[in-house]
């Protein structure tokens, strides 16, 4: 169900949410594509965890959600305790469905990396797919260097490009269902019992 926002309502959002302090912003009616408010649409910004939208879309489009995926050392070696994570360990077996849900609901960097290697064989190969998809979608101000959004000066996007990606992602039924989930409990794995 789409909610339409009047222009005056967009102005109210601007005032209430202190959007004026954002480096860049875009408020868009997703159904029509009409821009209700924008600020520095094409200014380069760091996407952080919104990167995971692209990772999820590639997993949903290229993967089989029933696949059992084994977490590898290569997928997990760059994840730190300070990162958002699910606590995946080398050798953990989860389905691709569990990984995508965990990545989107918990913003789990470890899940993003495990997904990337499962889909493309390596993090670098997956990043190539991310950049190809960005170009296909017309995201001309975007360049990815990792699947989880870890900061890197060469990992960037724009508010306009994030709107393009978000609008595309919301057309995917599975993606839409996952991002509506307020919480996701991962069932028992080969290494962890379910609580």
Where are the regions that the model predicts?
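Single conserved hydrophobic/aromatic residue that forms the stacking wall/gate
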Residues: 1-10, 14
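Short, well-ordered beta-to-alpha junction loops that form the rim of enzyme active sites
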Residues: 5, 147, 180
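Active-site-adjacent loops and short helices of periplasmic peptidoglycan-processing enzymes
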Residues: 11-160, 164-173
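Extracytoplasmic
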Residues: 163-195
